[in-house]
Amino acid sequence: MSLLFSRCNSIVTVKKDKRHMAEVNASPLKHFVTAKKKINGIFEQLGAYIQESAGFLEDTHRNTELDPVTTEEQVLDVKGYLSKVRGISEVLARRHMKVAFFGRTSNGKSTVINAMLWDKVLPSGIGHTTNCFLRVGGTDGHEAFLLTEGSEEKKSVKTVNQLAHALHQDEQLHAGSLVSVMWPNSKCPLLKDGLVLMDSPGIDVTTELDSWIDKFCLDADVFVLVANSESTLMQTEKQFFHKVSERLSRPNIFILNNRWDASASEPEYMEEVRRQHMERCTSFLVDELGVVDRAQAGDRIFFVSAKEVLSARVQKAQGMPEGGGALAEGFQVRMFEFQNFERRFEECISQSAVKTKFEQHTVRAKQIAEAVRLIMDSLHIAAQEQRVYCLEMREERQDRLRFIDKQLELLAQDYKLRIKQMTEEVERQVSTAMAEEIRRLSVLVDEYQMDFHPSPVVLKVYKNELHRHIEEGLGRNMSDRCSTAIASSLQTMQQDMIDGLKPLLPVSVRNQIDMLVPRQCFSLSYDLNCDKLCADFQEDIEFHFSLGWTMLVNRFLGPKNSRRALLGYNDQVQRPLPLTPANPSMPPLPQGSLTQEELMVSMVTGLASLTSRTSMGILVVGGVVWKAVGWRLIALSFGLYGLLYVYERLTWTTRAKERAFKRQFVEYASEKLQLIISYTGSNCSHQVQQELSGTFAHLCQQVDITRDNLEQEIAAMNKKVEALDSLQSKAKLLRNKAGWLDSELNMFIHQYLQPSR
């Protein structure tokens, strides 16, 4: 068991050691590759985030249901950020590490590049001088090609000789021209990591140094000065890098003292020459250019032989040993020096390229993310404030709605009671006034003046005009007695209703309440209809002697009983049956008992029946009276009776007939009008009730409109609050996403841009 455990531990240890060795042996150029991949991913996420934010802001700005929570300027700003991020992403996708090699003609710049690429990519050696700028980059294809400046034509190049021939045959190329040599990545692993090497003509063959710097050097991450170790640094070389230092802040410069293999022929002077070159190069970098300090200068100056390294690496690529062939003494030291240069160079260019290529864009990305975050934060705050305002407005309207419902219920009960009381009072006033007017009906009838004639035609017209006079007079008198007071009370009641319900209406409606609630001039209509009421009136304007038998009976018994007596009804007077059921607790009346009035009617009826049957009664009565009082008294009585008859007959004129007609009409009309007192009072009270109920209904209609508006506003507020909640959540999410992107950028800065301690 312990053996198995120890074996497992050893396996884990071996795996960890291998992983560590892989990390150690990994090319520093991978740092740039991973940084580029990381920053491209961040910018891709940033672009998607800004696009989402721009769409969200635009939709929010176009939402007319909400109050403005964002401005058009903010929408345009975010859209501008989107275009900037897309532009930066395109630039980052094309970014690569760039190293520029400079030096005098035939110092071995092309040989150094070939040695670093482990292959003879560029023409070099005796008879080959670079007459233009050569940009060496990698391609995923399997065939090499070159592109000349201003042309998209890919010229196939399979060998170095073909490349050299193509460069020399192109007459349009000059020292300031650029030719891109695209070499397959499969042949040069160094090019896989996005490294571009720039070869240049000798800086001692042209005076256009400024244009070279502007055109080819401003985006270079590292400059390599390839010097000839057999001579010292020339003023031309120094002048060029002084110009570079003026254009760029602290450029990364390496100095390669090439052809150091020549020192092997004079080993006794090797260290002295090396020390002199080191001092002069250090002084140039530290004192003249000020790009490094003295402690760092040793890592920027190297003594190499590019030709030896290239030869050894080509032999190794072909399967032969590195040390094969005639190599000068100290080759391994120079090989190690060149490898050390490559290591320092890769570390420097990866750090420098990440910083120069990504730092500015990273800072810009942080600024954009922060700007969008601030916009989302302001939108979140504005939406929150608007939501609080909407909640307050909704609560206010809900309170207002509850207040209206409660007040309307109380006012409805109160006005219902007051309307009932007022209608009862109106009915009482109208009934009382009508009863008084009926008692004064004779005065109104006496005021009627029109020619009277007993003929039926004239009498009919007389009746119709009298009916109209009575109706107009009663209506006028009733109006004078009741209408003004009732109308005043009604208007007061209507105004009380308006004043009571006005607080329930909006301010804008209160000022227009008189126009919204129709208030016509109220006038009571009594509708007596005297013509129909007295249509059955039958006048009796024939002459009737006051002491005649009919008048005497009528005077003592009344009109109804006199007709019964004179017309000779049955002797047996039947007692009418009661209309209501008899009370069983009371003893029943005897069948034979009669009232005094009924007994008198029965006696007179019997007497009239007796005189009508025989004339003997007259003789008997006359004889009795004759014997009792004597003939003189009887004659005198008959004489006076006759004179009275003649007087009454002579005074029975048209005027007397008119008075009799009016007296009979007053009696008849008074009786009929008494029957409709209650109806007229109820009719007037109903009119008042209808008017007041109509006014209250119109006011309630306006209140209902106000309630409906409040309910609609509350529903709109609820919808608005939901929209603001969604808006607030989305703005908060986007704000937090901006913070997350900022943390990703900070992590990138910490991991790739800040110097390691």
UniProtKB/Swiss-Prot annotation:
Q: Where is this region: G5 motif?
A: 288
| Topological domain spans for side Cytoplasmic | 1-604, 648-757
The record lists GTP as bound by S106, N107, G108, K109, S110, T111, N258, R259, W260, D261, S305, K307
Q: Which GO terms describe its cellular component?
A: cytosol; microtubule cytoskeleton; mitochondrial outer membrane; mitochondrion
Question: What are the transmembrane regions?
Answer: 605-625, 627-647
Domains (record comment): A helix bundle is formed by helices from the N-terminal and the C-terminal part of the protein. The GTPase domain cannot be expressed by itself, without the helix bundle. Rearrangement of the helix bundle and/or of the coiled coil domains may bring membranes from adjacent mitochondria into close contact, and thereby play a role in mitochondrial fusion.
Origin organism is Rattus norvegicus
Q: In which tissues is it expressed?
A: Ubiquitous. In brain, it is more expressed than MFN1, while it is expressed at a weaker level than MFN1 in heart and testis. Expressed at high level in elongating spermatids of seminiferous tubules. Expression is markedly down-regulated in highly proliferative vascular smooth muscle cells (VSMCs) from the genetic hypertensive animal model SHR, as well as in balloon-injured Wistar Kyoto arteries.
Show the segment(s) annotated as Part of a helix bundle domain, formed by helices from N-terminal and C-terminal regions: 30-94, 359-385, 722-753
Q: Which UniProt keyword terms apply here?
A: Apoptosis, Autophagy, Coiled coil, GTP-binding, Hydrolase, Membrane, Mitochondrion, Mitochondrion outer membrane, Nucleotide-binding, Phosphoprotein, Transmembrane, Transmembrane helix, Ubl conjugation, Unfolded protein response
Q: How is it modified after translation?
A: Phosphorylated by PINK1. Ubiquitinated by non-degradative ubiquitin by PRKN, promoting mitochondrial fusion; deubiquitination by USP30 inhibits mitochondrial fusion. Ubiquitinated by HUWE1 when dietary stearate (C18:0) levels are low; ubiquitination inhibits mitochondrial fusion.
Protein known as:
Mitofusin-2
Protein family (similarity comment): Belongs to the TRAFAC class dynamin-like GTPase superfamily. Dynamin/Fzo/YdjA family. Mitofusin subfamily.
User: What's the reported outcome of changing K109T?
Assistant: Induces mitochondria fragmentation when overexpressed
Coiled-coil region(s): 406-435, 696-738
Query: Residues annotated as region G4 motif?
Result: 258-261
Q: Corresponding gene?
A: Mfn2
Region (G3 motif): which ranges?
199-202
Domain named Dynamin-type G is located at 93-342
